Amino acid sequence: DYVPKSVVELPSYERVKEDKRDYAIASRRELEEADAVRGKTLIQRHGKYILVQNPPMQPLDTKQLDYVYSLPYERWYRECYESLGGVPGINEVLFSITHNRGCFGACNFCSLAFHQGRAVTVRSEKSIIEEAESFLDNPRFKGYISDVGGPTANFRLPSCEKQKKLGLCKNRRCLAPTPCPNMQVSHTEYLDILRKLRNLKGIKKVFIRSGIRFDYLIEDENDEFFR
């Protein structure tokens, strides 16, 4: 059957179901096209049907992320869970702050690149500080921010300037097997945000509990983040 050049066909559902190699091929093609700039439409045959997946939308920009995190979330589980003993895991994230989205690390064992994409977008400093200040009105808050992180805590920049126009590289990874020479590396803004949060009245300590990419960290010529 004719398949347009603007479309990438994955191995059929039946082939993926029966063959590990076809499963791997389908997964790789899906990851390669998961880019809002250059990603193509994906199709996969499923019996007499054809599944169509449209190209990814543009990731939320800073203004949009700020809006999402400005909404009046309850920061607690619904009352119906009380009879089941509550939700113990809520305490791990109750007073944590997400400052970014996306990860260009693309580790083989990790699914972050699939469900958040490789393009990194961030919230503004103002939005992050306002969320921290909102904790002070919560009677459960004891002064400890458990995490200021995200998929990868120490990513505050796009991987490179080229990705804005050309998208992320299809057949290369930014950090492996060796860091790309075009990669932007800086922890200055992230460190500044952490310090401003720590200095807020009512904040005792600020922690990082999300993963830190050390291979990215050691590429930074400024070693202040280590101190």
Name these PLM-found stretches:
Residues 71, 97-102, 108-113, 123, ...:
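Generic beta-strand/beta-sheet core signal
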Residues 82-111, 129, 142-144:
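N-terminal pre-triad scaffold of radical SAM enzymes
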Residues 55, 59, 80, 89, ...:
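Cysteine-cluster motifs in flexible loop/terminal segments that predominantly coordinate metals
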Residues 1-93:
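Flexible, acidic/Gly-rich N-terminal and inter-domain linker regions that tether
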Residues 134-227:
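Conserved SAM/AdoMet-binding glycine-rich loop
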Residues 1-11, 85, 118-126, 132-138:
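Extended, regular secondary-structure scaffolds
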Residues 96-108, 119, 127, 131, ...:
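Cysteine-centered iron-sulfur cluster-binding motifs in ferredoxin-type domains/subunits
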Residues 41-50, 69, 77, 106-116, ...:
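Short acidic (Asp/Glu) and glycine-rich catalytic loops that position anionic groups and cofactors
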